[in-house]
Amino acid sequence: MKLLLDTHIFLWLISGDEHLPLEMRDAILNLDNAVYLSVVSYWEIVVKYQLGKLPLPQPPELFIPIQRVQHQIELLVLDEVSVLQLPHLPSLHRDPFDRMLICQALAHDLVFITVDSQVMAYQSDKFIIFGNSN
């Protein structure tokens, strides 16, 4: 499978947070799966860090790439194909970061890993969203 991590899932994974459901952790750590973190998540993390809403042990420009490499997570760039999904996406969720992550999952046939109930409203046959947190 090709997995796209929602921002909170990436943060839970790298911090060892117990909110990360076991089935998600197992899927992410399964070496048969390709795991991606979107540049959109980088952007979200940097914005929240700058606003003082997300403490990190190092500045995000150092911390995120190190954690991504240590956890064998590939970077997913934002491309035109993904952005052009946006006009076709129902307005079920107001968060622009989540909306663009959903577009990337749809555009690239990725399994989107999240526990965000608002994102789950977008569930379709093109990608799967795992269930609830512990």
Predicted regions and their residues:
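Alpha-helix capping/helix-boundary segments
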Residues: 9, 41, 82, 101, ...
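Acidic, PIN/NYN-like endoribonuclease modules and their adjacent C-terminal/linker elements
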Residues: 100-134
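Acidic catalytic patch
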Residues: 64-91
